Amino acid sequence: MIKDEAYLDLLSENFVDFDFERCSSSNVFAYAYNEKTNVLIVAFKGGKIYQYLRVKPSIYHGLQKAESKGKFINSQVIQKGFKYRKYEVQEPENK
């Protein structure tokens, strides 16, 4: 399992136009939104990262206010069928 700070650094380095917000969710590690491109990025614990396309600002603002980030993402993003790109982070091998 990748360490939290290393995961956050990786996100910031690879998605430079996004400011990630950490959250205290059992499934969601962090999320970020770019209002210029309407892209929402959700980084899940365990290393899966989803980049959701054409997400309205109102969805992002709802996510910010949601008590359960995971439930909100499931009902308002995943179940709504937003197109996405999926990435997966793997722990580097020790040599």
Q: What do the PLM-derived regions correspond to, one by one?
A:
Residues 2-95:
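Acidic/histidine-enriched, beta-strand-rich ligand/metal-binding domains
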